[in-house]
């Protein structure tokens, strides 16, 4: 298979006209040549933090605080999940997965509520889809054993030492929320030696020093943080210290659109477009241990083809900036997963 157009090549997303040569799902070559194609070829997205279980309750809880919305065990999300039957939860998640696939997401890192059964429900929701998520079980060691790792709610919610050690012994991924409500749980989260931290809205200089010294990646979800009224993470400062990826967080409060997350982060921070696009692709893949997120030889051919001649993208003078700040679902020509 060949994919032609203006290709955003490598980790710097250098625009080159040509074709991506794909064999058996792997990028074999990138050939520079005139193609006459108006397509823009970018890596498919990696959504580095999601909770798609609450797809059953989109826009529920308007005006509620963070704790009232999502804090375990009795936040609105958890009450709704307990009161909803399995079939409905699977069907709602399946529609979210379909939406992510259609909008160019190759993988998502899911903090999966519900223990072992929660992991099983997500796998049922993935039937006939090409999206390949990284599933982090929650609540129990058994859920971790049945998934790709463990996603902890936050150090203030319990003692995660035993689960952290079990996850390490299993050679799996351990992520934890930190600094979402305030700074109090950031040091305890770092003490667990996590593979990555999520949110870090209230990160302070001493935390940044520890994060940099220990090379702990960060996942930020700025749209979600605004909805829950906790502030916004210092994305620019984090990006100067560590690997930063973007996530869309709860479907209850935000659509799982990486286009929207990129645009918001770009306009919030005014970071270079290439930096933001890395946060939506390569950096999430790096955190999750995936072989995608960048167009180069030997990578998995997870590609998103945009129409560079759409009403929205035509006449763009900076292709990467246009992709980050204005591209959307309507501009997609094809998704190759």
Residue ranges and their predicted role:
Residues 1-34:
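N-terminal metal-binding scaffold of metallo-dependent hydrolase/deaminase domains
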Residues 5, 20, 25, 38, ...:
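Divalent metal-coordination and catalytic microenvironments
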Residues 191-192, 234-310:
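His/Asp/Glu-enriched, well-ordered alpha-helical/loop segment
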Residues 43-55, 172-181:
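Histidine-centered catalytic micro-motifs
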Residues 300-337:
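C-terminal cap of metal-dependent C-N hydrolases
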Residues 181-183, 195-256, 263:
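Active-site neighborhoods of metal-dependent hydrolases
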Residues 111-195:
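Metal-coordinating catalytic core of metallo-dependent amide/deamination hydrolases
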Residues 40-41, 58-128:
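Alpha-helical scaffold segments that flank or form the walls of functional sites
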């Amino acid at each position: 298979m060949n994919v032609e157009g203006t290709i955003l090549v490598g980790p710097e997303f250098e625009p080159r006209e040509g074709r991506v040569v794909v064999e058996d799902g792997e990028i074999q070559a990138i050939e520079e040549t005139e193609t006459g194609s108006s397509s823009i070829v970018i890596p498919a997205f990696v959504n580095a933090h999601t909770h798609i279980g609450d797809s059953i309750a989109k826009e529920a809880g308007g005006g509620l605080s963070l704790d009232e919305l999502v804090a375990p065990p009795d936040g609105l999300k958890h009450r709704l999940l307990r009161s909803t039957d399995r079939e409905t939860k699977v069907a709602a998640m399946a529609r979210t997965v379909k939406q992510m696939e259609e909008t160019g997401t190759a993988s998502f890192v899911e903090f999966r509520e519900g223990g072992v059964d929660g992991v099983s429900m997500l796998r049922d929701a993935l039937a006939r889809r090409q999206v390949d998520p990284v599933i982090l079980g929650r609540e129990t060691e058994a859920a971790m054993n049945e998934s790709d790792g463990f996603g902890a709610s936050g150090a203030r919610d319990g003692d995660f030492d035993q689960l952290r050690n079990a996850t390490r012994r299993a050679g799996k991924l351990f992520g934890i929320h930190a600094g979402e409500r305030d700074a109090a749980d950031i040091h305890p989260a770092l003490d667990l030696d996590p593979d990555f931290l999520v949110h870090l809205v209230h990160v302070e200089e001493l935390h940044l020093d520890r994060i940099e010294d220990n090379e702990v990646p960060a996942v930020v979800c700025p749209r979600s943080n605004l909805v829950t009224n906790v502030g916004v993470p210092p994305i620019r400062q984090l990006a100067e210290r560590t690997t930063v990826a973007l996530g869309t967080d709860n479907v209850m409060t935000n659509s799982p659109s990486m286009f929207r997350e990129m645009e918001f982060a770009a306009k919030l921070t005014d970071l270079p477009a290439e930096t933001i696009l890395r946060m939506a692709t390569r950096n999430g893949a790096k955190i999750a241990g995936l072989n995608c997120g960048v167009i180069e030889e030997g990578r998995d051919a997870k590609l998103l083809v945009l129409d560079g001649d759409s009403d929205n993208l035509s006449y763009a003078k900076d292709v990467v900036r246009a992709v980050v700040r204005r591209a959307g679902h309507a501009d997609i020509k094809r998704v190759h997963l």
